[in-house]
């Protein structure tokens, strides 16, 4: 939606772009009413039980992971059009095309995520920060080259889709007894990550230039990876304690 809207705005006017955006939203609303089935209710979960998931160390660490990994991706994404214009030096139409590549790759990433999480969720979570860091390093080093930037953006778009699924998995896995509340926590954590990531990346832009917004991304990826290590270490200690026949208070 965003790339197409940008393309329309670049070739016509802001008014036409907003009309297109409104038409898409109305269409989605109508399709939701007539084609999305009602889901059966599973009963109301008491508020105390829902809030209780916030006492779980696994949930708290999952929230930290989501905030920082999502901040890493969308903190930079907030400035990606400016990056294309000032660093890669491409015109508005090409920027819209690049954003469309990103969006399509994001959809592909969602499909990939479903498969890799089914095969090995823990390994997928562990590897994700490394691949993210490598993709952003590639963009930092080759951002002035149009073809190389296009390749990096496709990879980053796919990783953004994978990241969203991994993040939601981490939150819901940590709070299965309150699925609706956990889903709300995921959305809140993701939005917080976008807010903080945009702020930090913006500071680097103010101090240097748009290219160095990626430094904020590297920081967020690093902190997210540390949180992943802490969560995995905690899970391992709980498994070890359970195997030893000890009583464990933490629930994963």
What function would you assign to each model-found segment?
Residues 122-167:
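C-terminal transmembrane helical hairpin of 12-TM major facilitator-type secondary transporters
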Residues 35-65, 250:
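Juxtamembrane intracellular "pre-TM" segments in multi-pass secondary transporters
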Residues 58-100, 104, 121:
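Extracytoplasmic gate region of multi-pass secondary transporters
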Residues 173-210, 216-217:
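A late C-terminal transmembrane helix in Major Facilitator Superfamily
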Residues 1-36, 79, 83:
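Helix-loop-helix hairpin linking two adjacent transmembrane segments in secondary transporters
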Residues 7-23, 203-222:
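A membrane-interface helix-boundary motif in multi-pass transporters
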Residues 9, 108-121, 205-206:
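Helix-to-loop junctions at the C-terminal end of transmembrane segments
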Residues 31-35, 218-252:
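Multi-pass alpha-helical transporter architecture, strongest
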């Amino acid at each position: 939606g965003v790339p197409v809207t940008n393309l329309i705005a670049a070739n016509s006017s802001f008014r036409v772009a907003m009309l297109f955006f409104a038409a898409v939203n109305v269409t989605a609303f109508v399709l939701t009413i007539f084609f999305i089935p009602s889901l059966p209710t599973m009963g109301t979960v008491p508020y105390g039980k829902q809030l209780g998931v916030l006492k779980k160390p696994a949930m708290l660490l999952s929230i930290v992971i989501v905030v920082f990994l999502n901040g890493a991706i969308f903190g930079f994404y907030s400035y990606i059009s400016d990056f294309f214009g000032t660093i890669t030096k491409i015109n508005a139409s090409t920027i819209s095309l690049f954003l469309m590549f990103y969006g399509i790759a994001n959809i592909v990433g969602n499909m990939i995520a479903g498969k890799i999480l089914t095969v090995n969720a823990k390994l997928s979570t562990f590897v994700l920060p490394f691949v993210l860091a490598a993709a952003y390093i590639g963009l930092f080093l080759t951002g002035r080259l149009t073809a190389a930037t296009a390749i990096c953006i496709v990879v980053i778009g796919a990783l953004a889709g994978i990241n969203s699924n991994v993040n939601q998995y981490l939150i819901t896995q940590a709070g299965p007894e309150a699925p609706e509340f956990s889903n709300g926590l995921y959305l809140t954590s993701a939005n917080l990550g976008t807010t903080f990531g945009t702020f930090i990346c913006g500071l680097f832009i103010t101090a240097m230039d748009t290219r160095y917004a990626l430094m904020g991304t590297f920081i967020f990826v690093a902190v997210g990876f540390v949180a992943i290590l802490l969560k995995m270490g905690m899970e391992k200690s709980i498994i070890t304690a359970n195997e030893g026949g000890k009583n464990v208070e933490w629930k994963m």
